Design a protein with these regions (language model features):
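Residue(s) in the substrate-gating loop at a strand-loop-helix junction
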Residues: 155
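A conserved structural motif in NAD(P)-dependent oxidoreductases
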Residues: 228-240
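Canonical Rossmann dinucleotide-binding motif of NAD(H)/NADP(H)-dependent dehydrogenases/reductases
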Residues: 2-40
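Active-site helix of classical SDR
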Residues: 134, 171, 179
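Substrate-binding pocket helix/loop in short-chain dehydrogenase/reductase
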Residues: 110-111, 115-123
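Short, small/polar-rich loop/turn modules that mediate ligand/substrate recognition or access, typified
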Residues: 187, 192, 255-257
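Short C-terminal tail/terminal secondary-structure segment
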Residues: 160, 231-232, 244-245, 256-269
Length: 269
């Protein structure tokens, strides 16, 4: 029996990258999943968007594990669409035990050149989108009365200053406050909330040449901020998914309000 037998997870941003890895790894451990992704451009994001074909591939990979999967194209900036997908999952699968708030975007700029639109796009997706995701499932956790687990994918940038990504860094710091507030407010209901803070990961979002150019031009002054202390340049998605599986499992039943670093020493610099 897998570590997540009996669990049903609601996962955003699951078309590719970390989100796909989380969905497949959770399914391999016995969870059924409800997955979503916008599968299209998001404002000023500097990363090429996921596609409907990407989401279909995630569905295929989950189904190959033998687990059930419900999916739809959903923008986390649209709370009613998130609520509708959550309710569909509850109707078809019976309940939800776990939320993995993974959807996010990244853009970059010198802060004095950052536009209002660039700022707002990242805040709307990374911070408000996570709030919308929490609100889509929290009432169900309370009504069901059997606890629940919120796993919020933040970033190393949620625990340290990261230049050239002011909106992203601000949003990811905001997620720490959100998680800690949830953990305190809803602990009495056995509802847990934790955040994960990863170093760079080998995904489309982790491969951003434009940001690399900004860093390279200032390698002496800011370069070390982006460097791991361990001898690895980038993490693999599975490194983060292993933490997700743990936090979703009963092994972590009393773990809440945690900022879990999967960072190869990055935050320590």
């Amino acid at each position: 029996m897998g570590r997540l037998a009996g669990k049903i997870a609601f996962i955003t941003g699951a078309a590719r990258g970390q989100g796909r890895s989380h969905a497949v790894c959770m399914a391999e451990e016995g969870a059924d999943v409800i997955i979503s992704d916008i599968c299209g451009p998001v404002g000023t994001s500097g990363v090429a968007p996921a596609t409907p074909e990407d989401l279909a591939e995630t569905v295929r990979l989950v189904e190959a594990t033998g687990r059930r999967v419900i999916w739809d194209r959903v923008d986390v900036r649209e709370p009613e669409a998130l609520k509708a997908l959550a309710q569909r999952g509850i109707d078809e699968l019976g309940y939800i035990t776990t939320v993995v708030a993974n959807a996010g975007i990244l853009n970059w700029s010198r802060t004095h050149e950052l536009t209002q639109t660039q700022w707002q796009d990242v805040i709307d997706v990374n911070l408000t989108g996570t709030f919308n995701t929490v609100q889509a499932v929290l009432p169900h956790f309370l009504e069901r009365g059997q606890g629940g687990s919120f796993i919020v994918i933040s970033s190393a940038a949620g625990l340290k200053g990261q230049p050239f990504t002011l909106g992203y860094t601000s949003a990811k710091h905001g997620l720490v406050g959100m998680v800690n507030a949830l953990a305190i407010e809803y602990g009495e209901y056995n509802i847990r909330a934790n955040s994960i803070h990863q170093a760079g990961v080998t995904t489309p979002m982790g491969d951003v040449p434009g940001l690399g150019e900004l860093i390279g031009e200032r390698a002496f002054t800011v370069g070390p901020v982006f460097m791991n202390t361990m001898p690895v340049e980038m993490l693999e998605p599975i490194d983060v998914s292993n933490a997700v599986v743990y936090l979703a499992s009963d092994e972590a039943r009393y773990v809440t309000g945690l900022q879990m670093k999967i960072d190869a020493g990055l935050v320590g610099r």
